[in-house]
């Protein structure tokens, strides 16, 4: 009987020890930064690898051209009235470089950690900066005291891990509080009510290089009939020797 009680007591002690160790691991995980918990490394220099919508991205489409964008009837007067010179004069030359469009603008990215819980994306096209903040709560939640809308808006991020071991994961980002801009350089609009959802994934290339795959979903109840989805790709570069920031322009 005493041996049985001793055995039971031993099992209980082992369970407490295991439970305590598990709780400690969970506590350590919850206190770790987003940088420490990253399942994939997105940092470095990346150049656009244009595999879709070449004719709409590499040159400015003609006025009135909005094929492949599910523009609503409300968008058509703006599309047909597009005047790049007027935009430039009004200081709106960055309208096609906002968060809903910037990843599709051909150019280079520089991705770094601004701090332990903020991933920073700089673009040489338009010299834009996106700050992806790993904040508590659901991505896309806008604070009650949100600042004025900006071209890059407010981006909340979180890591999404794959269930299988050693298979990495992806980054999910939701951006809101955007200043109204253009989905394409020729004046196809999106409104301040737009929300941009993105997934960032990595994929190997046959030559040993790495691709950054960005799936972008733009939702706008004002100027889009249905969500607009694009998938710009970027190839990793060895260094920043080709990094060449240029200002926004509405005329080229």
Protein language model features and the residues they cover:
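Bacterial N-terminal signal peptides that target proteins for export
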Residues: 1-9
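PEST-like low-complexity, intrinsically disordered acidic/proline/serine-rich tracts
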Residues: 2, 20-252
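Bacterial N-terminal signal peptides
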Residues: 8-17
């Amino acid at each position: 009987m005493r041996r049985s009680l001793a055995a039971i007591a031993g099992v209980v002690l082992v369970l407490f020890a295991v439970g305590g160790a598990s709780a400690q691991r969970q506590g350590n995980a919850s206190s770790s930064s987003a940088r420490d918990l990253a399942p994939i490394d997105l940092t470095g220099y990346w150049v656009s690898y244009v595999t879709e919508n070449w004719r709409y991205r590499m040159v400015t489409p003609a006025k009135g051209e909005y094929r492949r964008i599910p523009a609503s009837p409300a968008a058509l007067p703006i599309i047909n009235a597009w005047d790049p010179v007027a935009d430039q004069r009004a200081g709106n030359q960055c309208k096609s470089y906002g968060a809903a469009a910037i990843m599709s603008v051909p150019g280079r990215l520089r991705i770094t950690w601004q701090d332990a819980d903020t991933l920073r994306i700089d673009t040489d096209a338009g010299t834009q900066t996106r700050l992806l903040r790993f904040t508590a709560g659901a991505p896309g939640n806008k604070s009650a005291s949100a600042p004025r809308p900006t071209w890059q808006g407010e981006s909340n991020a979180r890591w999404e891990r794959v269930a299988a071991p050693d298979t990495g994961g992806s980054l999910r980002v939701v951006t809101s509080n955007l200043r109204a801009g253009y989905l394409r350089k020729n004046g196809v609009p999106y409104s301040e009510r737009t929300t941009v959802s993105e997934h960032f994934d990595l994929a190997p290339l046959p030559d040993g290089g790495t691709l950054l795959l960005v799936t972008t979903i733009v939702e706008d109840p004002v100027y889009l009939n249905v969500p607009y989805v694009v998938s710009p790709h970027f190839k990793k570069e060895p260094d920043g020797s080709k990094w060449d920031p240029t200002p926004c322009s509405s005329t080229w």
